[in-house]
């Protein structure tokens, strides 16, 4: 398939603006020395080009998308319809408060909903993504300790099964990351946690349920120990879909949390955004909240605010979509978690007789296959199985994560998939298993039916071509 630059023909493009009859000359300094390399192509050819590209990709509208820890659920179209209402799309963030009262009311209502779901006292919608929400929460923790004169607390504890953004966010916030072990059951090793708690502990970052799909049975003890050591507890809300409406993070000892509107609350993934990672916090952290807060038509800033995390209010239209979703679901929001957990356990039970499950117990919203025993016998890897699934019209699960499971396949079906879809996926996994032992090369050479076949990973790493070269 040709690149759009290769389809470009000089002169085929058309100026957007008509010629101006007012003489004008810009200073030379801001002008380009050479013409920009922009493709010149007709509108219908451009439409065909990107439609063809879309057909070469796989999204939630194309088929099953069990990407673990990503909650690739259906994005209801009513969300898009509401977010496209002119009353929302034509707003400008610099408008006077009295002209955007409807938008402010929506933000206030959504904050109230999320506080009810999490048990927290307040929410900032400024963070534009999950990791951005983590960073915001850690800055709140840091501001809290510094306000108390507790400058020695410079360590954030994370488990070895944590999302990679956790230590990255801690580093960005100026903390040293302390990694603790998981126990044989896949949850936090309490003894290792105790050994690393101390006067330098600023907090603990924890996903619960964690990345192997298990809810930590010792969570109350874990948060108590951190608090007794003087630290705060941060809840990574990436897996909130497993417990929404059933467990409130604040009730199990957490002080601050980020949520992914583009996961749990059904707003779209992909395309580089926009995402939204609102950060909720308990009342004692409210004095440090970022951005401006609108109450009764007046904008105020928290007295000890950490400042702005982004411009204005955050990604407002994403909030509209999440708000629509929650109004649609209503008080039965707990059914999301129930069905997500049911679907994951159904798949796990149907596959555990042939695939080694990393932690063979009732899971939450996702489960992890540890393919290492099979790989040692056949040299068919988790990557090979993931590639083979593409030939069945299934997006691969997350692979090689969490790091505590060798040859990991992390599978999250979400609550929006039907039993028929799950059964088709289960059958695909079982057929691939048979091929692993009877025709391993067919799996190792997969996929065979996709527009792009298996790449030469070694060549791509050693001789990358990352940009189009113009003559």
Regions found by a protein language model. Give the residues of each.
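Non-catalytic terminal extensions of PLP-dependent enzymes
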Residues: 1-121, 247, 297-305, 309, ...
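Conserved phosphate/anionic-ligand binding catalytic regions in large, soluble enzymes, centered on
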Residues: 58-79, 126-134, 265-280, 313-324, ...
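Short, flexible loop/turn elements at secondary-structure junctions
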Residues: 71, 129, 162, 210, ...
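Conserved PLP-enzyme active-site core in the AAT-like
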Residues: 102-105, 132-296, 304, 379-380, ...
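Long, K/E/R/D-enriched contiguous segments that form extended
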Residues: 108-112, 118-121, 126-137, 141
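General small-molecule cofactor/ligand-binding pocket signal
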Residues: 124, 178-180, 397
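Short amphipathic alpha-helical face segments that pack within enzyme cores
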Residues: 135-136, 140, 280, 317, ...
């Amino acid at each position: 398939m040709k690149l759009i630059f290769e389809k470009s023909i000089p002169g085929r493009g058309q100026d957007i603006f008509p010629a101006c009859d007012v003489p004008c000359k810009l200073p030379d300094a801001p002008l380009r020395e050479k013409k920009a390399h922009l493709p010149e192509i007709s509108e219908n050819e451009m439409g065909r080009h990107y439609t063809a590209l879309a057909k070469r990709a796989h999204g939630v509208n194309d088929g099953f998308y069990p990407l673990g820890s990503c909650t690739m659920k259906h994005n209801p179209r009513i969300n898009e319809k509401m977010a496209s209402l002119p009353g929302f799309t034509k707003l400008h963030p610099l408008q006077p408060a009295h002209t955007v009262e409807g938008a402010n009311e929506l933000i206030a209502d959504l904050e109230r909903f999320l506080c009810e779901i999490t048990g927290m006292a307040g929410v900032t919608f400024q963070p534009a993504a999950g990791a951005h929400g983590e960073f915001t929460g850690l800055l709140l923790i840091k501001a809290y300790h510094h306000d108390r004169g507790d400058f020695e607390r410079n360590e954030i504890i994370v488990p070895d099964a944590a999302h990679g953004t956790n230590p990255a966010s801690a580093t960005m916030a100026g903390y040293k990351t302390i990694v603790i072990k998981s126990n044989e059951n896949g949850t936090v090793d309490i003894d290792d946690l105790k050994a690393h708690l101390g006067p330098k502990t600023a907090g603990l970052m924890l996903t619960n349920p964690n990345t192997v799909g298990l809810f930590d049975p010792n969570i109350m003890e874990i948060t108590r120990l951190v608090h007794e050591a003087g630290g705060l507890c941060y809840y990574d809300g990436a897996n909130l879909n497993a417990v929404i409406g059933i467990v409130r993070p604040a009730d199990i000892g957490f002080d601050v949390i980020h949520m992914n509107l583009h996961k749990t609350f059904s707003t779209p993934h992909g395309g580089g955004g926009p995402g939204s990672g609102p950060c909720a916090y308990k009342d004692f952290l409210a004095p440090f909240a970022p951005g401006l807060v609108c109450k009764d038509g007046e904008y105020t800033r928290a007295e000890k605010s950490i400042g702005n995390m982004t411009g204005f209010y955050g990604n407002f239209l994403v909030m509209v979509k999440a708000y629509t979703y929650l109004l649609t679901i209503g008080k039965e929001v707990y059914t999301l978690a129930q069905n997500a957990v049911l679907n994951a356990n159904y798949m796990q039970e149907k596959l555990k007789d042939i695939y080694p499950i990393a932690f063979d117990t009732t899971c939450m919203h996702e489960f992890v296959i540890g393919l290492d025993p099979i790989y040692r016998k056949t040299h068919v890897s988790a990557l090979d199985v993931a590639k083979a699934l593409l030939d069945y019209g299934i997006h691969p699960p997350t692979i090689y994560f969490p790091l505590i499971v060798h040859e990991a396949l992390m599978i999250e079906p979400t609550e929006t998939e039907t039993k028929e879809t799950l059964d088709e996926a289960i059958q695909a996994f079982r057929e691939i298993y048979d091929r692993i032992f009877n025709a391993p090369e067919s799996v190792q050479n997969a996929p065979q039916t996709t527009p792009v076949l298996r790449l030469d990973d070694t060549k791509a790493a050693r001789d990358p071509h990352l940009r189009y070269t113009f003559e």
